[in-house]
């Protein structure tokens, strides 16, 4: 039976091309038009509400229509909305840069502003390459990336990604990247457990660095969680050993904290848990609490000095975006950081993370099609499998995660899947009752789906 569309849905399907979507799916399952947000909830045209368990693609930290952030944005909009950022600056950007330098690892002293996560990755890749070109290491023209990595969808970012869903069609256009097998604690090739392993799988990276370090400019990694690959989580010792290898072989380390930064892993930045300082740190998403697009690339004085010279040397970093250092976004980011500090939200996230872990383990551990529930900080993931003992994956063509996602929406819960992995990444303001609803509804939906599937 064909669904009756609202006027806005009809106009949407007539003109809008949605991201990461097969638009033909929308004929049977049209986009939900959201009219307002409040706290962890999104409300559609019929005032049906949905608990935003994915923080609207991992960006929202302190709730939709947060009064404090909205007020800061409004006040700034009546003073200065934007200004060119070449030869000009403004107070919110200056204060934000100063604050980020104070919060991140000590060696990160310079802040370059960009618009979004993919843009930040492009900046870091270009900076690293140009640094080596300008310091006499002209043979360093390749990057090393991990299998199942995701760093964005521009061509440079895709070049260091490893998820075929996004990469495969563009392969002829991508950079010649060195690949190393990444960590997979659920299906560990060494049969180790992440709580007690010594990151033996770092040997895959070490082998590639030993062979190719003279031509590698940087290794890029998502610290602690390979998010888009299905929330693949690994221990901090892997990061520590990777930092040691990068130093040993004279290659940069780029930490892509776009998804995991700003408290998601239980510390303000994931790199803190390994006590490492990367050469570049890319930040976005939670930086503005889900309000406005903004990203930054943080780097060292050593990198900065390789570009600092007389104009005639042509060593400047000639990269820009029209909305670089947008005033509104910077002001919002300052308010987000103030909320973290004044309301001690890292402690809140850690406490709520333990509550979520307890509820989730009770709910999912004994379900026959759940291979594993895993969690780092305030990110939880349910890996659905065909066989718990062998960890055999479910057939991707059945789109089981997508089927569960649709059923959950009908129950008022937004849990957009990653293949056959369902995950929780809710706003930090979620209450205990809302968390209980999120987990119980997910369990009920999984059970309902597999009962229907088995007939």
Swiss-Prot record:
Q: Which gene encodes it?
A: bioA
Q: Which residues carry this modification: N6-(pyridoxal phosphate)lysine?
A: 285
Residues reported to bind pyridoxal 5'-phosphate:
117-118, 256
PROSITE patterns per UniProt: AA_TRANSFER_CLASS_3 (PS00600)
What is a single molecular function from GO for this protein? Answer: adenosylmethionine-8-amino-7-oxononanoate transaminase activity
Q: Which NCBIfam families match?
A: bioA, PRK05964.1
Q: Which family does the record assign?
A: Belongs to the class-III pyridoxal-phosphate-dependent aminotransferase family. BioA subfamily.
Which UniProt keywords are listed?
Answer: Aminotransferase, Biotin biosynthesis, Cytoplasm, Pyridoxal phosphate, S-adenosyl-L-methionine, Transferase
Catalytic activity reads: (8S)-8-amino-7-oxononanoate + S-adenosyl-L-methionine = S-adenosyl-4-methylsulfanyl-2-oxobutanoate + (7R,8S)-7,8-diammoniononanoate
Does the keyword section mention Repeat?
Answer: no
Activity regulation remarks: Inhibited by KAPA at concentrations higher than 0.05 mM.
Query: Could you state one GO cellular component term attached to this entry?
Result: cytoplasm
Q: What is its EC number?
A: 2.6.1.62
UniProt GO BP: biotin biosynthetic process
Intracellular or extracellular location(s):
Cytoplasm
Query: Can you name this protein?
Result: Adenosylmethionine-8-amino-7-oxononanoate aminotransferase
- Its source organism is Lysinibacillus sphaericus
The record ties this protein, via InterPro entries, to: Aminotrans_3, Aminotrans_3_PPA_site, BioA, PyrdxlP-dep_Trfase, PyrdxlP-dep_Trfase_major, PyrdxlP-dep_Trfase_small
Residues annotated as site: Participates in the substrate recognition with KAPA and in a stacking interaction with the adenine ring of SAM? 20
Purpose of the protein: Catalyzes the transfer of the alpha-amino group from S-adenosyl-L-methionine (SAM) to 7-keto-8-aminopelargonic acid (KAPA) to form 7,8-diaminopelargonic acid (DAPA). It is the only aminotransferase known to utilize SAM as an amino donor.
Q: Where does substrate bind?
A: 57, 150, 285, 320, 416
Q: What superkingdom heads the lineage?
A: Bacteria
In which pathway is this protein known to take part?
Cofactor biosynthesis; biotin biosynthesis; 7,8-diaminononanoate from 8-amino-7-oxononanoate (SAM route): step 1/1
What quaternary arrangement does the UniProt entry report? Answer: Homodimer.
The cofactor required is: pyridoxal 5'-phosphate
């Amino acid at each position: 039976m064909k669904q009756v569309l609202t006027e806005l849905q009809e106009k949407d399907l007539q003109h809008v091309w949605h991201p990461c979507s097969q638009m033909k799916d929308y004929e049977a399952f049209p986009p939900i038009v959201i009219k307002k947000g409040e706290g962890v909830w999104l409300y559609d045209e019929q005032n049906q509400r949905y608990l935003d368990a994915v923080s609207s693609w991992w960006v929202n930290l302190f709730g939709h229509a947060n009064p404090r952030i909205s007020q800061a944005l409004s006040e700034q909009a009546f003073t200065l909305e934007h200004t060119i950022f070449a030869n000009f600056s403004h107070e919110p950007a200056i204060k934000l840069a100063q604050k980020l330098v104070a919060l991140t690892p000590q060696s990160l002293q310079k802040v370059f502003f960009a618009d979004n996560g993919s843009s930040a990755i492009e900046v870091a890749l270009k900076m690293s390459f140009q640094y080596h070109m300008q310091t006499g290491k002209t043979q360093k023209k390749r990057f090393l990336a991990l299998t199942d990595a995701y760093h964005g969808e521009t061509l440079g970012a895709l070049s260091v990604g490893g998820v075929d869903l996004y990469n495969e069609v563009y392969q002829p256009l991508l950079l010649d990247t060195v690949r190393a097998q990444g960590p997979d604690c659920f299906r560990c090739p060494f049969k180790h457990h992440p709580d007690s392993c010594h990151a033996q799988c770092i040997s895959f990276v070490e082998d590639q660095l030993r062979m190719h370090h003279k031509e590698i400019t940087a290794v890029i990694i998502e610290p602690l969680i390979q998010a888009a690959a299905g929330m693949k989580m690994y221990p901090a010792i892997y990061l520590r050993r990777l930092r040691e290898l990068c130093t040993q072989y004279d290659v940069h380390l780029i930490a892509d904290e776009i998804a995991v930064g700003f408290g998601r892993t239980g510390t303000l930045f994931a790199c803190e848990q390994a006590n490492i300082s990367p050469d570049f740190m890319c930040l976005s998403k939670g930086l503005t609490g889900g309000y406005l697009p903004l990203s930054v690339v943080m780097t060292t004085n050593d990198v900065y000095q390789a570009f600092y010279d007389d104009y005639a040397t042509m060593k400047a970093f000639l990269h820009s975006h029209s909305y670089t250092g947008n005033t509104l976004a910077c002001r919002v980011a300052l308010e987000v950081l103030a909320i973290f500090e004044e309301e001690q939200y890292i402690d809140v996230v850690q406490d709520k993370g333990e509550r979520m872990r307890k509820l989730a383990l009770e709910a999912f551990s004994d379900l026959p099609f759940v291979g594993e529930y895993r969690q780092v900080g305030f990110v939880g993931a349910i890996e659905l499998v065909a066989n718990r003992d062998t960890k055999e994956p479910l057939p991707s063509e059945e789109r089981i995660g997508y089927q569960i996602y649709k059923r959950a929406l009908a129950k008022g819960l937004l849990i957009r899947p990653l293949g056959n992995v369902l995950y929780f990444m809710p706003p930090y303001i979620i209450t205990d009752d809302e968390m209980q609803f999120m987990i119980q509804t997910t369990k009920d939906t999984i059970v309902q789906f597999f009962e229907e599937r088995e007939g």
